[in-house]
Amino acid sequence: MEFAFYICGLIAILATLRVITHTNPVHALLYLIISLLAISGVFFSLGAYFAGALEIIVYAGAIMVLFVFVVMMLNLGGSEIEQERQWLKPQVWIGPAILSAIMLVVIVYAILGVNDQGIDGTPISAKAVGITLFGPYVLAVELASMLLLAGLVVAFHVGREERAGEVLSNRKDDSAKRKTEEHA
């Protein structure tokens, strides 16, 4: 399992560097997904199976879906035909494909290398994780959720385009301003 730890760690570092250096947000999201899956592989190789599963479900699943929706709302991905043709070029998808293939080899190696006597660690139940998470760390969990929500709202407002005739609010001051702009 030491081999799996080092390979997953290397993949996580390389994918994270690509997230930071990539200019296209859609490609950066793909590398971020690979990085999160590699980090879950690190957890699995260390014997923290529950933490690895949570990493996949929460981060690589739920939060990445949130990021994809934000990119779609901001229209950062672009849906032009020429850009979609560029995405099919090998230099775009070969990096994530190679890293994913290495992760597949590591996962198959880890599955085949499991001993028949079971897991050597003490299992941690979801109830114990929940009690710990929402006991002494409840403030941190709530602050993290508020931070994610604030980031989503800010990204929406920054990326939103103003359209002619769009009603932004129902306040009296805004409606009077809108009427003067329409007559001007």
Curated annotation (Swiss-Prot):
Q: Where in the cell is it found?
A: Cell inner membrane
Q: Say which family it is in.
A: Belongs to the complex I subunit 6 family.
Q: Which residues cross the membrane?
A: 1-21, 28-48, 54-74, 92-112, 138-158
Q: Which GO terms describe its biological process?
A: respiratory electron transport chain
The membrane topology term of the UniProt record is: Multi-pass membrane protein
The record ties this protein, via NCBIfam families, to: PRK06638.1-1
> What broad taxonomic lineage does this protein's source fall under?
Bacteria, Pseudomonadati, Pseudomonadota, Gammaproteobacteria, Enterobacterales
* Primary localization class, coarse: membrane
Q: What is this protein called?
A: NADH-quinone oxidoreductase subunit J
Pfam families in UniProt:
Oxidored_q3 (PF00499)
Record keyword Cell inner membrane present:
yes
Q: Which organism is it from?
A: Escherichia coli (strain K12)
**UniProt KW keywords:** Cell inner membrane, Cell membrane, Membrane, NAD, Quinone, Translocase, Transmembrane, Transmembrane helix, Ubiquinone
Q: A GO molecular-function term, please?
A: quinone binding
Question: According to its UniProt record, which reaction does this protein catalyse?
Answer: a quinone + NADH + 5 H(+)(in) = a quinol + NAD(+) + 4 H(+)(out)
